[in-house]
Amino acid sequence: MKKAVQAKFIKTAILNKDYPIIRSPSGDILPEVAVVGRSNVGKSSLLNHLFEAKHLVKTSATPGKTQALNFFSLNDQIAFADLPGYGYAKVPPSVRKEWGPMVRSYLESRESLKLILFLLDIRRIPNEEDIQFLEWVLYHEKALILVLTKIDKVNQKELRLNTTKILDTLSLMNLHHLYYSVPKNRGRKELMIMIQDALNDEDKQE
């Protein structure tokens, strides 16, 4: 019998001092996975699919409007931080400016952060914001998995061509990546394995 998935919403926070310390029942601090991507890339849908919950992660009616981090736990084993989406054109400039310092503060100071899931829409070539973020992650030597979302929107030829274009644009042909589609129910098992493997590798390095 398949073991039931237990996902829980923990907290919404804006300031570093308000970020929760998420622990296992035995008191150990859980390794944390940050989920990052442009607005409309499908972060909420992917997390709900990953958690096997329809509405645990709320989808904003106005993408990019709320500049806050949402924290979750999965099976009391892994913590997840859903970072606000970036790049939404209709967001006021003042709100857009908040994204950089907030996310940078989280990524630089969060000791429990062990892995970043970087989501990109398979139909979109990475722009300057995407490349800058990836360069920052690599500079700080953070573990990262590239998740190419919305693959149900392209055919097999487009999938191959777009993957090559994306990896070429990022100048990282050997970057760990996988395909994800919520409507096709594709990618969850593979992503969970990659997450666990990455967290195990982090444990060995510490």
Swiss-Prot record:
A cellular component term, taken from the record's GO annotations: cytosol
Cross-referenced CDD domains: YihA_EngB
Keyword Cell cycle: yes
GO BP term, example: division septum assembly
Requisite cofactors: Mg(2+)
Domain EngB-type G intervals: 29-201
One Pfam family per UniProt: MMR_HSR1
Matching InterPro entries: G_ENGB_dom, GTP-bd, GTP-bd_ribosome_bio_YsxC, P-loop_NTPase
Binding site for GTP: 37-44, 64-68, 82-85, 149-152, 180-182
Keyword tags: Cell cycle, Cell division, GTP-binding, Magnesium, Metal-binding, Nucleotide-binding, Septation
GO function term, MF aspect, one: metal ion binding
Residues engaged in binding Mg(2+): S44, T66
NCBIfam families assigned to the protein according to its UniProt record, in alphabetical order: GTPase_YsxC (TIGR03598)
HAMAP family: GTPase_EngB
Protein family per UniProt: Belongs to the TRAFAC class TrmE-Era-EngA-EngB-Septin-like GTPase superfamily. EngB GTPase family.
Summary of the function given for this chain in its UniProt record: Necessary for normal cell division and for the maintenance of normal septation.
PANTHER family: ENGB-TYPE G DOMAIN-CONTAINING PROTEIN, MSS1/TRME-RELATED GTP-BINDING PROTEIN
Name of this protein: Probable GTP-binding protein EngB
